Amino acid sequence: MAIKLAILFTTFVLFSLADARIPGIYSGGAWQNAHATFYGGSDASGTMGGACGYGNLYSQGYGTNTAALSTALFNNGMSCGACFELKCANDPQWCHSGSPSILITATNFCPPNLAQPSDNGGWCNPPREHFDLAMPVFLKIAQYRAGIVPVSYRRVPCRKRGGIRFTINGHRYFNLVLITNVAGAGDIVRASVKGSRTGWMSLSRNWGQNWQSNAVLVGQALSFRVTGSDRRTSTSWNMVPSNWQFGQTFVGKNFRV
C-alpha cells in the first residue's frame, strides 16, 4: 500500500511540474521612441504573408492591425507575435488630434536599405527602431501625406480569442509547426512536442513562428509545450489525436492575460 501511494505521489508531482505555469500575467514594457511608416495599400493586401509565416492575416485573426519591424525590433524573428501600443508623437502637423493610440501585432520584417541613410529612406536600418505599419492602422494615428511620423511605443499584453493554434505542415520526416494566436507576451521563444510513444523533444525555430522537428510523429497523439519571452509556459496535453493529417490546425491552452 505504501509503495502504491509513493508511486501515485511521484506521478502527481511529475504531472504537476510539467503542467506548471509561471504565475501572474504579462505586464508589457515602458514607453520608448521610434518612427513609423506604412505599406501594403489601402486594403493591407500587401501585408499578407510576411517573415513571421502567418500567411493570410485575415484568416489568422490578425487583420490590419499589424506591423513589419526593423532589424532592431524584429530580433531574428523572435518578436513575431509580440503586441505593441503606438501613439503618434510630437508632430502636430501630421499627428491626429488627441494622440489616439493603436494596438498592433508584429507579423513581418522591415528589411534595411543600406543604400539610403537611416534618416532619409533607410528607415529600417539598424540600429533604428521602426514600425512599418499596415496602411489602414497608420491612418488611425496620422495623415496619409505624412509618410513618416515619430511615435511613442511600448510592449503590451496580447489579447486573443480562443487558444493557441498549432498548424502542422510538412511530411513524414519533416514536421513544420506554425504557432499562432498567442496571448500574453505573444511571442514564443521555446517550443517542444511529445508523441504518445516518445518523450518531450525540442522544436527548433525554422523561420518566424514556424518550428520544426525531423522526428516521425505520424500516427501518434501529440502534446505541445510553448514558452513566451516572459518565461511563462503553457502545456497542452494530447491535444492532437493520433489520426491527425498534415495541414490541420489544432487548438491548445492559451496564456492568461
Swiss-Prot record:
Tissue note: Expressed in the vascular bundles throughout the plant.
Limits of the Expansin-like EG45 domain: 49-163
GO biological process, one term: syncytium formation
Disulfide bond positions: C52-C80, C83-C158, C88-C95
Segments forming a coiled coil: none
Cited SMART domains: DPBB_1 (SM00837)
Domain Expansin-like CBD: 173-252
Membrane topology classification: Peripheral membrane protein
InterPro entries linked: Expan_Lol_pI, Expansin, Expansin/allergen_DPBB_dom, Expansin_CBD, Expansin_CBD_sf, RlpA-like_DPBB, RlpA-like_sf
Compartments in which it is found: Secreted, Cell wall; Membrane
Keywords: Cell wall, Cell wall biogenesis/degradation, Disulfide bond, Membrane, Secreted, Signal
Chief subcellular location: secreted
Taxonomy, superkingdom: Eukaryota
GO cellular component: extracellular region; membrane; plant-type cell wall; plasmodesma
Signal sequence coordinates: 1-20
Pfam families xref list: DPBB_1 (PF03330), Expansin_C (PF01357)
Purpose: Causes loosening and extension of plant cell walls by disrupting non-covalent bonding between cellulose microfibrils and matrix glucans. No enzymatic activity has been found.
Family according to the record: Belongs to the expansin family. Expansin A subfamily.
The name this protein goes by in its record: Expansin-A4
Organism lineage string: Eukaryota, Viridiplantae, Streptophyta, Embryophyta, Tracheophyta
Protein's gene: EXPA4
